[in-house]
Regions:
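Short glycine- and acidic-rich boundary segments immediately preceding or forming the N-terminal edge
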Residues: 1-18
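Aspartyl protease catalytic core from the pepsin/retropepsin fold
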Residues: 16-38, 72-129
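A short acidic Gly-Thr/Ser loop motif
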Residues: 39-44
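Eukaryotic short linear interaction motifs
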Residues: 45-46, 103
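Hydrophobic residues embedded in beta-strands of well-ordered beta-sheets
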Residues: 46, 135-137
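Short hydrophobic alpha-helical segments that form membrane-spanning helices or hydrophobic packing faces
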Residues: 47-50, 126-128
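A compact, surface-exposed functional segment
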Residues: 50-85
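Short acidic-glycine loop/turn motifs at beta-strand connectors
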Residues: 131-133
């Protein structure tokens, strides 16, 4: 599910987006493509908006599952996708969902475009500590 290729203590700030939205949103990269992820410990798994896939490098898997969101229950395929920041790279499992309506609503009201969700399994496996007072995520 999560494989860190080079392990270091990292710190990522979400202060700017938190001031705009009240949500912990961080920017990570897939090669040179910037992706804004909502860090959502209420979500079990990681999700990527299907509209973004045409711009990304990833590996398809044979795995799929039923996902529950505001649109109901949907079957979702799973991909493995490398994401990185200035501290290193990780290959992460993502469920593909059409989250355009939900993410576009946040973009209209708060001015921040979200491309995906990093869920609680990612946070646990990466050893993340979310500090809302400092608006930083540590690993």
């Amino acid at each position: 599910m999560y494989k860190r290729c080079n392990k270091k203590v990292t710190c990522v700030s979400f202060e700017e987006t938190f001031k705009k939205t009240g949500l912990p949103i961080i920017t990570l990269y897939n090669d040179c493509c910037a992706l804004n992820f909502l860090v959502d410990t209420g979500s079990d798994v990681n999700c990527i908006n299907k509209d973004k896939l045409k711009y990304l490098h990833y590996t398809e898997t044979n795995k799929s599952g039923n996902m529950v969101n505001s649109s109901g229950v949907n079957k979702s395929n799973v991909i493995m996708m490398p994401i990185n920041d200035k501290h290193g790279i990780a290959v992460v499992e993502f469920y593909i969902l059409d989250l355009s309506i939900q993410f576009d609503t946040i973009a209209v009201y708060d001015g921040v475009k979200i491309d995906g969700i990093l869920g609680s399994k990612f946070c646990k496996n990466a050893g993340l500590i979310i500090n809302y007072n400092d608006c930083k995520i540590y690993s």
